[in-house]
Design a protein with these regions (language model features):
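Rossmann-fold cofactor-recognition segment
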Residues: 49-64
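Substrate-binding pocket helix/loop in short-chain dehydrogenase/reductase
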Residues: 66, 90-91, 98-103, 192, ...
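Conserved mid-core segment of classical short-chain dehydrogenase/reductases
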Residues: 81-100, 182
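Short, small/polar-rich loop/turn modules that mediate ligand/substrate recognition or access, typified
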Residues: 165-167, 225-226
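Catalytic Tyr-x(3-8)-Lys segment
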Residues: 189-210
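Catalytic loop of short-chain dehydrogenase/reductase
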Residues: 99-103, 107, 111-112, 126-164, ...
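C-terminal substrate-recognition "lid" of short-chain dehydrogenase/reductases
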Residues: 204-231, 236
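Conserved glycine-rich cofactor-binding loop
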Residues: 14-16
Length: 238
């Protein structure tokens, strides 16, 4: 098993791509720590993971909470940070507090995770951030998230140099079928997925397991650092 004897921290590991990553890592022998704000979601996620898993509550928008998380976790091998909030809407209509909250979650949250997690990473370890394809192919209504994703990719490149030999990369998913869309009306969700599927060379929406595979690849490949891996069904080509 590739990750036997290693500890992996997944912030945002209670659902979606984070949960898929945690499951896959445990299946490959890792001891996993999943962290998120909701204790209830953490308990449900832990029940789905067959193997060594610990849960920790954290608010990635609070520096003291992130610092406390890594004080509890101690030394580990790999960190990934898929959990965050987003802000969508027309640029001229989107209020500043909403935009700032999204930055606090997706950019500053990952920044804090790297800041307090990096000193605990064992030799040969890595950090894998989460960005998104709108950094490369923005659409109307996604100006804030496009800017955040670009900032995350830039942070990964900069920290790959500054934190070396810790490897730092980013995964940039396309549209993936996760619980984030659960609040949408079923017919609206189906229409959106159909439209996106028709626009990408792969001809379909992504699956959480496919993003998890990309994350584990970046963890295990010792010669990949400072890279952004686009897992988007070819969306960046159109």
């Amino acid at each position: 098993m590739r990750f036997e004897g290693e500890k992996i921290v997944v912030i945002g590991g209670s659902s979606g791509m984070g949960l898929a990553t945690a499951k896959m890592a445990v299946a490959e022998g890792a001891a996993v720590v999943i962290a998120s704000r909701s204790e209830e979601k953490l308990k449900k996620a832990a029940a789905q993971i067959k193997g060594s898993v610990q849960t920790q509550k954290v608010n990635i928008m609070e520096e003291s909470s992130v610092r406390a998380l890594f004080d509890k976790v101690g030394e580990f091998n790999h960190l990934t940070t898929p959990g965050s909030e987003a802000a969508m809407g027309p640029f001229l209509d989107l209020d500043l507090p909403t935009a700032r909250k999204a930055f606090d979650s997706k950019f500053w949250g990952q920044y804090l995770a790297a800041k307090f997690g990096a000193p605990r990473i064992r030799p040969g370890g890595s950090i894998t951030f989460f960005a998104g394809i709108w950094s490369q192919r923005p659409v109307p209504g996604a100006s804030v998230i496009a800017a955040i994703n670009s900032a995350v990719e830039g942070l990964a490149r900069a920290l790959a140099i500054e934190l070396a030999p810790i490897r730092v990369n980013a995964v940039s998913p396309g549209i993936v079928d996760t619980p984030i869309y659960a609040a949408m009306a079923p017919d609206r969700k189906e229409a959106m997925f159909k439209e996106v599927s028709a626009s990408v060379p792969a001809g379909r929406i992504g699956k959480p397991d496919e993003i998890a595979q990309a994350v584990l690849y970046l963890m295990r490949n010792g010669y990949t650092t400072g890279s952004t891996l686009y897992v988007d069904g070819g969306r960046t080509l159109r």
